[in-house]
Each structure stands twice: as C-alpha cells, then as structure tokens.
C-alpha cells in the first residue's frame, strides 16, 4: 500500500495510534458497537445479542468503550432502575468505518472455513522425507 507523508501519524503519535487501533482490532468491541447502531441498549440486550460473550467480558468492554468516548452509559432512575448504553458521535463514526469490515467478514466466512479446512488437511498429511 502506498502512503503519502500525510497518511503517517506524527512520530510521537505512532504508539498512541496503535493503542486506539486496539479498539478496532478487538472483536468484542466491534460487535458491541455494531449492536448499538440502532440506538441505546440495555446490558442484558447486549449480552443476548453478542453471541458467546461472557458477562465479565461485556462489562470490561463496555467500561473500556465508555472510557475511550465510544459510548455513553446512562443510569435511568426508574423502578426498577436500569442502565442503557448508546454510541457517542465518535462511536457512530467508528461504526460507519468498521461496518464494511464486518460485512466483508460475513460475506467471506464460508470461503475462510473452506481455506482453513484445506490447509488443515494438507498440514495433517505427512510429507515424504
């Protein structure tokens, strides 16, 4: 990939950029962000919607995303009290930026499974000395 000088972060920001890109590289964070695309959701709704995530991991991810300014946490003072999570403006732009990646993943899942199976079959076949 060709880059121009404007594509590169300033020298001191390179490490900080990597830290921010950890959000994009984390599967749980992207899946949580995706679930918030249509508006605020409660913890239990997110837990049901994000297949395979544990309660602890979801709690950690929500706190991390809130800390990074990707989402907001709102406590509703009703009976019974509950909490909802929603994307911030910045979170919305993250959702827009990563939506094509998630769509690509879904579109190519079967081909990736086939490639892995073919690779694993070759790896299990002994080679001649």
Q: Regions from the language model: what does each represent?
A:
Residues 10-57, 63, 77-78, 84, ...:
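N-terminal helix-turn-helix DNA-binding core of bacterial DNA-binding proteins
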Residues 1-12, 67, 72, 86-129:
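C-terminal regulatory/oligomerization modules of transcriptional regulators
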């Amino acid at each position: 990939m060709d880059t121009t000088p404007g594509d590169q972060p300033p020298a001191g920001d390179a490490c900080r950029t990597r830290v921010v890109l950890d959000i994009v590289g984390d599967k749980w964070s992207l899946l949580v962000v995706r679930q918030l695309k249509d508006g605020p959701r409660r913890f239990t709704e997110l837990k049901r919607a994000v297949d395979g995530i544990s309660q602890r991991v979801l709690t950690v991810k929500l706190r991390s995303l809130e800390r990074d300014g990707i989402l907001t946490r709102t406590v509703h003072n009703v009976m019974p009290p509950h909490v909802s999570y929603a994307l911030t403006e910045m979170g919305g732009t993250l959702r827009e930026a990563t939506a094509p990646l998630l769509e690509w993943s879904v579109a190519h899942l079967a081909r990736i499974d086939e490639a892995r199976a073919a690779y694993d079959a070759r790896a299990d076949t002994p080679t001649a000395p």
